[in-house]
Amino acid sequence: NLKNYFSNLPTLEVIIWAHGLNCSDKISNFNYLDLTELLNSNVLFIASCINELGNLNKISTGARLLVVSSIWQIESRKNKFSYTVSKSALQGLIKSSAIDLGEDNILINAVLPGVIDSPMTRKHLSSEQIQAVKKQTALSRLPSPEDIANTVSFLVSNQNKSITGQSFVIDGGFIGSKNNL
């Protein structure tokens, strides 16, 4: 129960959601339960957290909220129907929440990483696949975890005075490439 858990927390100045589920499917064969599970995890959990924390007055005035999402929030991807639908729904959550939360000077944004140079990437992609992705980026390299962390750090800092309702792509120019998929 979120209410019981959150009631013991102090008032929060920064909240970051960096979680999610993924699955592979198409519109022609998606499973309703899988889509529902992804929507619950990737979208409704965040909305419920914001709602419950707000109702308990656990979000301080001027707080910074941030969602770590994915480039698939704004792009389509073959065989990732449920995942991209759930990530796309985050776009609406971020924009709509920014309007409501702005009344209390609370900022909410998202970062949308692409393929990152990380142990997880090396575990799930072959070196050939990684090289192919690198070739499809404007910078001919993958962003580092530090690239993501630096953007997150700024967005949740007091240096960020007026950026809200925005989603920042960190993909080394992958989306901008015409040959990326």
Tell what function each PLM region has.
Residues 137-148:
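A conserved structural motif in NAD(P)-dependent oxidoreductases
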Residues 21, 28-50, 66, 90:
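Catalytic Tyr-X3-Lys loop
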Residues 3, 7, 17-36, 55, ...:
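Conserved mid-core segment of classical short-chain dehydrogenase/reductases
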Residues 102, 107, 163-165:
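Short, small/polar-rich loop/turn modules that mediate ligand/substrate recognition or access, typified
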Residues 153, 164-181:
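Short C-terminal tail/terminal secondary-structure segment
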Residues 112-123:
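Short, flexible catalytic-loop segment of classical short-chain dehydrogenase/reductase
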Residues 55, 99-100, 161:
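Alpha-helical segment proximal to the catalytic Tyr-Lys
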Residues 64-89, 94-103, 115-116:
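Catalytic loop of short-chain dehydrogenase/reductase
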